[in-house]
A protein has these predicted regions:
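N-terminal Rossmann-like dinucleotide-binding module
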Residues: 1-45
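Beta-loop-alpha module in the N-terminal Rossmann-like domain of NAD(P)-dependent dehydrogenases
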Residues: 16, 49-108
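Rossmann-fold dehydrogenase core element
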Residues: 103-121, 141-146
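Predominantly a Rossmann-like dinucleotide-binding segment in NAD(P)-dependent oxidoreductases
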Residues: 122-206
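Contiguous beta-strand/loop segments that form the cofactor/metal-binding neighborhood of enzyme cores
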Residues: 183-258
């Protein structure tokens, strides 16, 4: 069994806690969160050791793996603290606020021989994996255009009070929503993004962060396409993510449930 701990018990931290707590190959030993109410509840209702300091938790419990599910601005320091001690890390997305932070974490993970996974779940969905296989097999011929989209009803009125409304904490549609689509484009095309042009990031309801992003993108292979993402769209009951790639012999289009 893998001795594991969780840092952060917000929405995603709670989800990971439920999944890891039930996993037959995981020994979830401790959780860490600064919220006193959460600490009290976990002390009363679970067998896990409860901490308000992630460094003390890591030094005391000595886990083999750590799940980091905190606001993005804390990712770098927490991930590096674990990796430098040879602890494997699963980090929620987006990985970091800057490319420099991300590159440093990747370098340390490689040097320490640690797993350092980021929570982009679309990579594990069957339709997207089949799309990747078909694209790599060349079934649509030479690709000439892609369209990556995501829409959902996250911010439908002016509001604040959470880290997602704070740009310095990593809030905003680009970081929180569009990062899923950007990662999917990288994954399926097998080519990293190199350029963005004509970027438009409107604030529809939010005061400090973007509620949508529209841009023309280019990847290393030279393939170009569009990005269209909005988390202030109430025509969708929940987040929907899709990718379309057109080639001179056909077209591939997929979301979480269908491929055509």
């Amino acid at each position: 069994m893998i001795k594991t701990a969780i840092i952060g018990l917000g929405k995603m931290g709670m989800s990971h806690c439920a999944l890891l707590g039930a996993h037959p190959e995981v020994d979830l030993v401790a959780i860490c969160d600064p919220d006193g109410l959460l600490q009290s509840a976990f002390k009363k209702l679970t067998k896990f050791q409860v901490y308000d300091d992630y460094k003390r938790m890591i030094e005391t419990e000595k886990p083999e793996a750590v799940f980091v599910a905190t606001p993005t601005r804390f990712h770098s320091e927490m991930v590096l603290y674990a990796l430098e001690r040879g602890i494997h890390v699963f980090c929620e997305k987006p990985f970091s606020l800057t490319s420099e932070e991300g590159e440093k974490m990747v370098a340390v993970a490689k040097a320490k021989g640690c797993v350092n996974q980021v929570g982009y779940h679309n990579r594990f969905i069957g339709t997207f994996n089949e799309m990747k296989r078909l694209f790599a097999a060349g079934v649509i011929g030479t690709p000439f255009h892609f369209m990556g989209e995501a829409y959902g009803p996250v911010v439908l009125k002016p509001k604040g009070g959470t880290w997602r409304a704070d740009k310095k904490s990593g809030g905003g549609c680009l970081m929180d929503y569009a990062s899923h689509v950007l990662n999917l484009i990288n994954y399926i095309t097998g080519s990293h993004l190199t350029e963005a042009r004509g970027t438009f990031m409107p604030r529809i309801f939010s005061k400090e962060v973007d509620d949508a992003i529209y841009a023309t993108l280019k990847v290393e292979s030279g393939l170009q396409g569009q990005l269209s993402v909005c988390w202030s769209d109430d025509t969708h009951r929940k987040m929907t993510t899709s990718l379309k790639i057109e080639g001179d012999k056909g077209k591939l289009e997929a979301d979480a449930t269908t491929l055509k």
